Amino acid sequence: MKPVQSRRLAFAALLSLSASCHAATEHWGWIEQSWLMPERMQAKAKLDTGALTSSLDARNIHRYKKDGERWVRFDVVLPTADSKAPVSVTFERKVLRLIKVRGAGGSDSRPVVAMDICLGAKLLREQFSLRDRGNMNYPVLLGRRTLEHLGAVDVSRTFTRKPTCGALAAQ
């Protein structure tokens, strides 16, 4: 085979591989339904490519020490599907780290914890900074560290799939 033909064949193979990989990438809407696991608390999640770390609407945040380690207790308050009284669940998690967030009102130190979240059929263990997001439209914000495990975000779509991690959570 001539060198020019070999290069063309190699280029065509790479182009084909690239196209097939691109087609296999999952696309998600900029708003998706999610479950906080293992409690299966339903929450709307905003997929935000502008944020690095994911954030969770946490109320009554109480930091404490447990066996010499930093822990946090907090409430997650979410509306129910039937729009009746919201449901509140208390979580306790080990603090993985603290992040400092600077804004117009000054700086703020927030705890970061690991949480399991279900999106579509994917069960992910991700890091979330805790903050009272009660004045925000979406209680869960998924940043780039989480989005890299999902796929591309299509800003023209919302609610592309329902959470289906029930069987996965039992494992």
Predicted regions and their residues:
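General helical structural elements
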Residues: 11-12, 148
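N-terminal signal peptide c-region/cleavage motif recognized by signal peptidases
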Residues: 18-20
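Pepsin/retropepsin-fold aspartyl endopeptidases
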Residues: 23-171
